[in-house]
Amino acid sequence: MRATKTMHVDATPEQVFSFMLDSTATPRGMTMDVVHESPDVVGTSYEWTFKMLGIPRKGVTVCTDYVPGERMVFRNFGAMEGTQTETVEPDNGGSMVTHEMDSRIAVPLISRFLDPLLRKAWEQNIEWGKQEIEKWTKSKKPTG
């Protein structure tokens, strides 16, 4: 499944990346743990699990490229194989975030049938992330 989605997020690029690098910031039904943390982010790897159609799926994601405040690229292995690219640029006091995914379920015959479910879950997770980043950012702003 290939998909791209661009949206405005009411948070700075630094805040967006801080959220994306937090392994505890995962949608309901998904867990993620840091397996290896690299000082320059590239090489950092995460183990993850989620359920699809009630069946637990597992895998590993590795950060393969990182330009602070601009771009992160991840490679997925296991139940989901492929790449994800997150590009962020300043936009009217917030950020314009582009999510690109080129991934598939690791079983080719099943993958084509599950692509519509995968796309829907991906879009829901992106919307969840936007809401969580904005909620987190608002809670960090000084009041007064």
Listing of model-derived features with the role each one plays in the protein:
Residues 11, 52, 90, 103-105:
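Non-catalytic surface loops within mature trypsin-like serine protease
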Residues 17, 56-58, 84, 98, ...:
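Short acidic, gly/pro-rich beta-turn/loop elements at beta-sheet edges
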Residues 77-82, 100-106:
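Short, solvent-exposed aromatic-acidic interface loops
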Residues 1-41, 144:
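Hydrophobic ligand-binding cavity/cleft-lining segments
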Residues 103-144:
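A conserved amphipathic terminal alpha-helix motif
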Residues 5-7, 59-65, 83-90, 101:
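Hydrophobic/aromatic beta-strand elements that line small-molecule binding cavities or substrate pockets
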Residues 34-80, 92, 96, 128-144:
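Glycine-rich portal/gate segments that line the openings of hydrophobic small-molecule binding cavities
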